[in-house]
Amino acid sequence: MMRKPSQIVHCISCDLSCQLFPDSAVRVQYCHNAAFSIWPDVNAFLKKGFIEKLLLDRHNHLSSGFIFVDFSFPNLRRFTDLQWADSLADSGMHIVLISDRSLTPLANYWILKSNKIQGIIYSDDDDIVQQQKMHRLFTGRLANSKRGRTLNYTEFILLKRFVSGISIQQIVN
């Protein structure tokens, strides 16, 4: 089965940008860099800022890499799919959410719903908190303490239906 381009995960550890998932590039086996990825890989500013602020001068003590999920409003449709976290977990990499302010309740919902997510970095976390979370993650501990409001199941289902194009009238009926 051919995967959609949006499900492909590439490494951001070096300029080669090797494919990590679903089909790993051969050169990944010989790479000495830790595997880090941002998914979906469409926000160049997030990618550059994340690499420079949180990944440089860090050492991952774990044998598997990390997928940092761009949990922002432009990607909302992806996160109403019940299988997105399971699909990324098939890569064997740790999943960490990078949540913007508007999707914090949905990110908190997924932290509670999925045991595949190792942590969450909020947009308003200060530098010290971000560094502490990265240290916890890179030493094999969780950084999944949630903060703020959380969607409940009913709110999630309503959001999913709105995103799929169902009107309020259709939902009520």
Predicted segments, located by residue:
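N-terminal regulatory/sensing modules of transcriptional regulators
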Residues: 1-141
